[in-house]
């Protein structure tokens, strides 16, 4: 019973106070990711939509990044 209560408490805390990085679990460290193809960029924007990420953050993450 203790473990069940603990698990429910942890789940509740995760639901009400999600970690910022968890929203971008499908990306690398909440930073811009180099997108090699339009399909990858489309997938990135779709994931932003699913995770309800604001457009400006999504644009920063999904737009291609020139690496120097």
Curated annotation (Swiss-Prot):
It is found in: Secreted; Host cytoplasm. Transmembrane segments: none annotated. GO terms for molecular function: ion channel regulator activity; toxin activity. Disulfide bonds join 44-62, 48-58. Keywords: Disulfide bond, Host cytoplasm, Ion channel impairing toxin, Pharmaceutical, Secreted, Signal, Toxin. Residues 1-21 form the signal peptide. Expressed by the venom gland. Residues 22-35 form a propeptide. Its main location: secreted. One of its GO terms (cellular component) is host cell cytoplasm. Negative results: has no effect on Kv1.2/KCNA2, Kv2.1/KCNB1, Kv3.1/KCNC1, Kv4.3/KCND3, TRPM8, and TRPV1. Has the structural arrangement of two alpha-helices stabilized by disulfide bonds (CSalpha/alpha 2(S-S)). Cell-penetrating peptide (CPP) with defensive purpose that induces pain by specifically activating mammalian sensory neuron TRPA1 channels. It non-covalently binds to the same region than other TRPA1 agonists (irritants), but acts via a distinct biochemical mechanism. Its binding stabilizes the TRPA1 open state and diminishes calcium-permeability. Consequently, it produces pain and pain hypersensitivity, but fails to trigger efferent release of neuropeptides (CGRP) and neurogenic inflammation typically produced by noxious electrophiles. Belongs to the short scorpion toxin superfamily. Potassium channel inhibitor kappa-KTx family. Kappa-KTx 1 subfamily. Monomer. This is Wasabi receptor toxin. It comes from Urodacus manicatus (Black rock scorpion). The lineage of its organism: Eukaryota, Metazoa, Ecdysozoa, Arthropoda, Chelicerata.
